[in-house]
Amino acid sequence: MALSLSQDRSFDDDDSVDGSRPSSAQAAFKVPKVPKKPAESASSSRRPSATGAAKSGASKEGAGAVDEEDFIKAFTDVPTVQIYSTRDLEDNLNKIREVLSDDKHDWDHRANALKKIRSLLVAGATDYDCFYQHLRLLDGAFKLSAKDLRSQVVREACITVAYLSTLLGNKFDHGAEGIVPVLFNLIPNCAKVMATSGTAAIRIIIRHTHVPRLIPLIASNCTSKSVAVRRRCYEFLDLLLQEWQTHSLERHAAVLVESIKKGIRDADAEARVEARKAYWGLRAHFPGEAESLYNSLESSYQRTLQSCLKSSGSVASLPQSDRSSSSSQESLNRPLSKWSAAPGRVPAGSKSSGSPASLQRSRSDVDVNAAAGAKARHSGQAGGAGRVTTGLTPGSYASLGRLRTKQTLSTASSVGSSQVDSRGRTRSKMASQSQRSDDSDCTPGSQSATPVGAGSRSGSPGRVLASTALSTLSTGAQRVSAAPGSHRRSRIPRSQGCSRDSSPTRLSVAPSNISHIYNGSKGARGSRIPRPSVSQGCSREASRESSRDTSPVRSFTPLGSGLGMSQSSRLSSSVSAMRVLNTGSDVEEALADALKKPARRRYDTYGMYSDDDANSDASSACSERSYSSRNGSIPTYMRQTEDVAEVLNRCASANWSERKEGLMGLQALLKNHRTLSRVELKRLCEIFTRMFADPHSKRDPRGFGTVESGISSASFKRVFSMFLETLVDFIAVHKEDLQDWLFVLLTQLLKKMGADLLGSVQAKVQKALDVTRESFPNDLQFTILMRFTVDQTQTPNLKVKVAILKYIETLTLQMEPQDFVNTGETRLAVSRIITWTTEPKSSDVRKAAQSVLISLFQLNTPEFTMLLGALPKTFQDGATKLLQNHLRNTGNTAQASIGSPLTRHTPRSPASWSSPLTSPTNTSQNTPSPSAFDYDTENMNSEEIYSSLRGVSQAIQNFSVRSQEDMTEPPRKREGDGGEETVDSGRTALDNKTSLLNTMPLLSSSPRPSRDYQPVNYSDSSFGSSSFNKSLKDADQEESLTDDSGVDQSEVVAELLKELSNHSERVEERKAALCELMRLIRETQLHVWDEHFKTILLLLLETLGDGEHVIRALALRVLKEILNRQPWRFKNYAELTIMKALEAHKDPHKEVVRAAEEAASMLATSISPDQCIKVLCPIIQSADYPINLAAIKMLTKVIDRLPKEGLIQMLPEIVPGLIQGYDNSESSVRKACVFCLVAIYAVIGEDLKPHLSQLSGSKLKLLNLYIKRAQSGSSGSDQSSDVGGQGL
């Protein structure tokens, strides 16, 4: 059965909904509504016409699409208006700006306002000087309109800015710079009218506004993850190189070279075509740079460039079917492809306008029912309908293989060539960055038919086995013949199960042979009933039958019988030596591994697109990922990915598959020792912090893995496992820069040890903990662990407690005695650990806590003794009992241990202490905690022991008295307890470490000072560091103190934070919580804030984005209050806090803006001036109104705090932004710049003058006037009115 011409449509013929083009010829050709023969289409001109009529209208782009011709018609298709005066024009423009700046106006009003701008332009608005001033003010309105959700508003906005560019040319430079990034965001839009409007507007701007600053804006999008955006970018670069003069390009020649270089290596075939066209445009302007670029390319890319030059010159250098589409909503109703073949490339007998359909895959991201319907409609296609005969299996693509050898491919005498890349597999339609092309990208109609699973996306082990055993792959051109009546399926595969093409039917040439081999399928053809696509979630079992490379069929199908191929050819040595597995055991191993892994979800990412699964989990032994895992090499596409921002974007993606690939890219960068900048580090730490919060347990309560969730829980665990691997590399490379993040890292890893994780994942968490322990300073880790132990916001479960204790215990083995510091936080932590020795629910916790106490005692005996002396009697009794029991149990004391108190004991035996941080449920049985120490009392008689005990008892009593004071101060003499003599005698006794093990029993009978610290309740659930520290500092004024108030305050703060985390919910409750928090700031002791400050700051900054303006204003006032009372805490958060405070000035509510101004003013007086200036200067130069205004005002306050010498050094950073602001269209910004310059002059005097050389004479005169007024004592209000009067 042959398909009729009218039915033969490709799923990819039409443009994707993200705005991608149907072929590389889009910018140059107008496709008529009636399909024409391919020969008629290839003779068109390569370049667009001067009017920009690159037709991409409805006939080509689909319903709703617009092009430049439509724009040109719409420019003047507007109501007629008349301009009577300058005032009349200003009134009209002000009304227009008011309507466009408020998206609450009805959408048709906004569309009419945009049309009215064009009406005014037609009426001659450009002849009025005031128009250009108002045009600057309209920038924000244009941006807002281009972002509108209504397509009609977006279309009118694009037409209007295009018309402005056409009329004003380079005078539209400022507007073009602002609007182009917004227009780029329209390109991947699923609404064609939006996507094509943005594209047409950018084209017109490029043609008429030749501003060099546009080049970086375009080039920055060349690394977009959207394939549609990248294609357009290279097309725009080509247009720009064609239209602009060389002098306009010179400044950014390096950017152009680098962008084109990336494009030539792009993963998308069509993007590569556009980049190659741009290369020849670059060569016309900069032959030297182009030559250098050419020489830096690999030979395969050089050949491709040359072959494109030698070709017909037509843009149709690629068949339309050889392209990718990133759309997840693409329509199945496609028009006929115009570029099915280029004339002269394919023998006439093999030409057919229906060929693309025979080479397309089904799409799993579209409606499966529609795909199944399309399959049914095309099921009777005959053998002669396409360029390639029966040998081409479903899923074949226009450019199926890439050959890396230097052999010239013969396309004149053969229908297609079978090319094998370095993987020893055929190449799918979408080329990854690791698959370098030769000339098939550039050769229309050079379809290849590969014998082994032609066109499938990954070479499974089975394919390699088949190719090796049967020797059916060849390095040269292979002919594929077919009898007219040969048995074959339709080449329109259906979406089945978890992949776009079911494995059993890939090799559909011999169904009878397949059916009895592949046991997992229900026959070679499979069911026509559509199954849920992977985007709806698929289980591992489902993927067995339908994933793209889990079928054993490919390795055993008798290819020769169905394909009529020559089996005498051999794999080239270069291919087989690199990638082909030659041993059967390797193949079996890899096949088993591949069968265990589920299919990869389809999506589009940088360098690895939907049809390239070189890195999918289901990839086979010959894929990049599995190959690199055996050989330790890094995948090629990862080696080429140097765009860290792109990698970080993927790591931060909500899509778990993208996140996985982002982590892989990050791993590759880290293994190449690519260091990250401070900003990149900060962002990556934030991303990792969020990843820790994601669910990864074996039994997650949120129901992941359902159809609704779209991804199985196994995927979460795989990504988390990869995250842990990346984390280890990240710590190893950047450990010197991560000390500020260590608290989050360490605490989150310890929490994960208490989660219900798989054994393999838990082992990776353990490895990360081991690396962390070895990478950071011991004293810093110890301080963090102490803080974490007493953190009131944490409620660790039993496993987490064991993990914390084991980590502390292991850490003490590598700590030096001086690393143990006796602080209030440490005393609290030790108290809590003592309570854990009586944990009723877990013997593991009890044993681990006992081991930690003994380890700490062993680490620094004098300090630990002092610490115990500061604790309440109940805690001393518990520690005494533990240590005494330990001594009795061991019965041994090493004589060598008697000596200096700073001498470390012999490390614990490896047999019992080798891995204290293994699984929390198993370690305690393997760790005989107290008995592991080797103490020896045989050489000491009882009199020595008891005399030592008496001395230590007195010393501890003395330390108990001193515990009310700061332990860092020298000991004070106290009447009645022996003064310094007692201390000395105690220290002498401390020299004998063994004696301390028997010291504690005497404490119960010895008298204690009246000011002993005796908390009422020191239970596990109520530790309060604030009252404890207060008692240490204020003991001389208070006779007794309980820690109830401290516990209450800390608990109150924790409850408030919990309430504040309900973003955009429970408004009244959160208002009350913020008010209470402000009260606590004024009353609470600082030690409570030691625990909670970071959490409070994070929540406050997040609350600034709340939906309620009252909440936003309150959050700013709380922030201001903290800044007022505890400014030193913001040292490490200055940049983030300043940015958030400045952004709050954009708030539409005046109450929030006032609060933001107060917070910014407090920041200017609280944060270090140097820090402020480093943050503010870039903002002043780059931010828009009103953020730049707020930054300038803040800078003015900061300048008042700077000394003359420091300010003079910083002038090169400060003054350029102020001079730029002096020209701002907003009068308030100009005023603020003048006041700031006056403030600078007040500090440094005439030293400012040399930096003002760029100012015009009138502006200098005006500045001098206000400097004189300031010197004469004019008030700020007078200055404000005067400056306004002078027309600043």
UniProtKB/Swiss-Prot annotation:
InterPro entries: ARM-like (IPR011989), ARM-type_fold (IPR016024), CLASP_N_dom (IPR024395), TOG (IPR034085). It is found in: Cytoplasm, Cytoskeleton; Cytoplasm, Cytoskeleton, Microtubule organizing center, Centrosome; Chromosome, Centromere, Kinetochore; Cytoplasm, Cytoskeleton, Spindle. GO terms for cellular component: basal cortex; cell leading edge; centrosome; cytoplasmic microtubule; Golgi apparatus; kinetochore; microtubule; microtubule organizing center. Pfam families: CLASP_N (PF12348). A motif (SXIP motif 2) lies at residues 527-530. One of its GO terms (biological process) is Golgi organization. Residues 1036-1046 have a biased composition (Acidic residues). HEAT repeats lie at residues 174-209, 210-246, 251-288, 718-755, 780-817, 1047-1086, 1091-1128, 1167-1204, 1209-1246. Residues 62-312 are annotated as: TOG 1. Residues 638-889 are annotated as: TOG 2. Residues 963-977 have a biased composition (Basic and acidic residues). A motif (SXIP motif 1) lies at residues 490-493. The keyword Transport does not apply. Residues 406-421, 468-478, 496-518, 891-900 have a biased composition (Polar residues). SMART domains: TOG. Interacts with microtubules. Microtubule plus-end tracking protein that promotes the stabilization of dynamic microtubules. Involved in the nucleation of noncentrosomal microtubules originating from the trans-Golgi network (TGN). Required for the polarization of the cytoplasmic microtubule arrays in migrating cells towards the leading edge of the cell. May act at the cell cortex to enhance the frequency of rescue of depolymerizing microtubules. This cortical microtubule stabilizing activity is regulated at least in part by phosphatidylinositol 3-kinase signaling. Belongs to the CLASP family. The two SXIP sequence motifs are important for targeting to the growing microtubule plus ends. This is CLIP-associating protein 2.
